[in-house]
Amino acid sequence: MRPAWSVILLTTLIGAAQGLFLIVFALDVLRSPPRDFVVLSCGISLALLVAGLAASFFHLGHPERAWRAVAMWRTSWLSREVIVLPAFMAMVLVYAVSESRVAGAIAAVLCLALFVCTAMIYACLKFLQEWHTPLTFVNFVLLGVASGLTLAVPLAVLRYPQFAGPLALAAFGAGALAWIVRVATLIRNARLRPKSTIQSAIGIAQPKIAQKAQGFMGGSFNTREFFHGKPKPVLGAVRWLFLALIFPAPAWLQGWGGGSLEVFLAAFALQFAGLLAERWYFFAEARHPQNLYYQSMA
């Protein structure tokens, strides 16, 4: 599939925002942190949500028609995401302003629902084997929580310094778990085999069939939208890059930082760069069955 940067930014930004909010609300319930820490964290979470929502509009051919997306909520996970995302944003704002844990609990439920909606947009597609797995949902949640925790550490240094250490330790654990599950997903996807072949696509049982031409010389919507257009060495390089950046690099910085705000911010920046690479690879890795026909170009 073709990685669209608007969707990459949407999913990574709102994932970090969701993770940050869940951590802050859990702390508010369990530890009663300073109010300015909660308000600052909710403000950052809202800013990330707004940025992600703004990025998503660049993926629309007609942004003025975006409101119509809600009409298909009975059958479309995308429509459900369009409903849940602004509802979650509104409840985060209410929680930050009102100090109401009831509002926070509603926001937490909406946050989890948003994880489900976003992940299921991809996991429900049975013909894309790389996505059609519960690991898609698990990865979205774990990577979101890990990035939210990594972002919470420098915010704690600013407003809740006595808890920055435990948060850094939690970020290490969440990052390690997210990394392990993502590696498990890579191993699973590497073992997948196409359910269709060129023989089954054209209904001929001849074992040796080679495509010589596809009827036109240039590209088309299909070859642009359903293939990333990059050679295998590029995919391999991106895979190793995100595996290094989403956990080992930020974990090393957090361990070496000694409570430094600048180092913790750098750890989040590195991890977020890794998340962008991971999400690009997530889309590029998915092999659309239609490329059996367009294989001379895809």
What are these regions (language model features)?
Residues 33-91:
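Membrane helical hairpin/interfacial module
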Residues 60-68, 122-127, 192-198, 283-287:
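Juxtamembrane/interfacial segments flanking transmembrane helices
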Residues 19, 24-29, 61-63, 154-161:
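Membrane-helix interface motif
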Residues 263-298:
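C-terminal structured interaction module
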Residues 56, 63, 85, 186, ...:
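General alpha-helical segment detector with a strong preference for membrane-spanning helices
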Residues 5, 10-15, 31-32, 75-76, ...:
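Long, contiguous internal "core" modules enriched in hydrophobic/ aromatic residues
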Residues 1-51, 272, 284-285:
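N-terminal signal-anchor module of multipass membrane proteins
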